[in-house]
């Protein structure tokens, strides 16, 4: 009876009201983290007029010589620390950032702890860590604090709580990282939000292939396996269509890229080879470094 009533309410409730209700629930949870999130105001226009490189995990990145990025500001994303040249890229006397998306199912808390612990062993102390928090019961803030991780790194936290639904109207306040910000569908969206907030005038994307629909799971990324990515498709979509799931995911991600592109004067270019991402113009990496 209760299940039937819940379905009926969902069916007849306007989607915009559903999303606004979700945003309100998220905001109430955000208040617990408001004080640490507002510290992000320190990053406002910190790199005004500069350029940076966002490093993703798409397989095309294997074809690039990334060592010259030692002399560039980079945002290494999620599992990038497993790249063979990671230590050299993150060296040098220039700012380096390491960013992760908010944690989420289907991974267990143990898997996340193991992943962050391993990451802590590889990310050099000169790197500034940027972690995402959401309304999940187990979040990265708890994991980092309870396991004394990244104790020698400077850390910033952002809170992901604003739903970007089909008829969402962009508001600059929604991508103010010193407040509650978007719920994005991939870490590269969060990295772009940060880079724009920090004032970069040029942002270059590497390894943002978004062509997993064309590959089997073991070829999604430049590495074969991640500590936190075991049987991810099977655990996430179960018996559903992988093509349908991936297509919807790409649509949502590209819509978010488009929102940022349409509402920012920042030059964003894609250096990823063999990519489906056509929101941004392509430029060969060798021509800019």
What is the meaning of each model-derived region?
Residues 2-289:
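Metal-ion/cofactor- or nucleotide/acyl-coenzyme-handling active-site neighborhoods
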């Amino acid at each position: 009876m209760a299940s039937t009533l819940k379905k009926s309410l969902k069916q007849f409730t306007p989607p915009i009201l559903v999303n606004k209700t979700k945003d309100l629930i998220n905001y109430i949870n955000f208040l617990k983290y408001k004080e640490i999130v507002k510290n992000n105001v320190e990053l406002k226009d910190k790199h005004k007029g500069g350029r940076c490189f966002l490093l993703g995990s798409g397989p095309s990145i294997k074809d690039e010589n990334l060592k010259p990025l030692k002399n560039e500001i980079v945002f290494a994303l999620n599992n990038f620390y497993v790249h063979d040249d990671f230590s050299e890229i993150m060296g040098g006397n220039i700012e380096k950032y390491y960013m992760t998306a908010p944690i989420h199912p289907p991974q267990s808390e143990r898997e996340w702890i193991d992943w962050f612990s391993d990451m802590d062993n590889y990310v050099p102390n000169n790197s500034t860590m940027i972690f995402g928090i959401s309304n999940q019961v187990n979040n990265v803030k708890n994991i980092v604090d309870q396991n004394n991780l990244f104790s020698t790194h400077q850390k910033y936290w952002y809170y992901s709580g604003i739903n970007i639904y089909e008829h969402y109207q962009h508001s600059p306040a929604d991508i103010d990282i010193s407040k509650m910000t978007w719920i994005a569908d991939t870490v590269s969206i969060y990295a772009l939000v940060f880079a724009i907030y920090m004032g970069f005038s040029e942002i270059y994307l590497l390894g943002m292939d978004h062509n997993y629909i064309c590959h089997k799971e073991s070829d999604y990324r430049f590495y074969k396996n991640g500590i936190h990515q075991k049987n991810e498709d099977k655990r996430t979509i179960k018996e559903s269509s992988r093509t349908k799931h991936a297509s919807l995911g790409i649509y949502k991600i590209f819509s978010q890229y488009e929102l940022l592109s349409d509402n920012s004067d920042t030059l964003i270019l894609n250096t990823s080879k063999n990519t489906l991402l056509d929101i941004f113009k392509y430029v060969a990496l060798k021509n800019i470094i």
